[in-house]
Amino acid sequence: MQHIALYQPQIAPNTGNIIRLCANTGAVLHLIHPLGFAWDDRRLRRAGLDYAEFADIQHHDDWAAFLKAVAGRNIWALTTKGTRSLYDATIGAEDVLLFGSETAGLPPFIHAELENTQKIRLPMRPTSRSLNLSNAVAVVLYEAIRQNLRAKTAINL
């Protein structure tokens, strides 16, 4: 199954939407702390409805703890600074799709730790800055699922 990682997300409703997405697809959600909201934020619950109980959500105190938890998995960083299109990447069924915060994206130290080939972007108009985080996660996750439909770890669509 796919893994979604959010690095220090800031907006509770986005994370709630992503929880719902992960519950419906079976993707594992990794939340890398600190979060920009309280875990019991009513906006998080409202956006995620009652889906949190059906999602596999893993909390990590920091980047190092996250890396330890996903050791051995390929990490794809979604970034507006990526030189490769999502559609040029071959995403494995157990790979991690990493997204930065809504306000700052991924920090420079993470960019420095990853190879350029691991940094991918969603194609969009040159004058556009970025997509909403929960929308971007949905687009990328379903592309990864599409690429792995025949894998035993893919969800049944």
Regions found by a protein language model. Give the residues of each.
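Post-transcriptional modification and biogenesis factors for structured RNAs
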Residues: 1-157
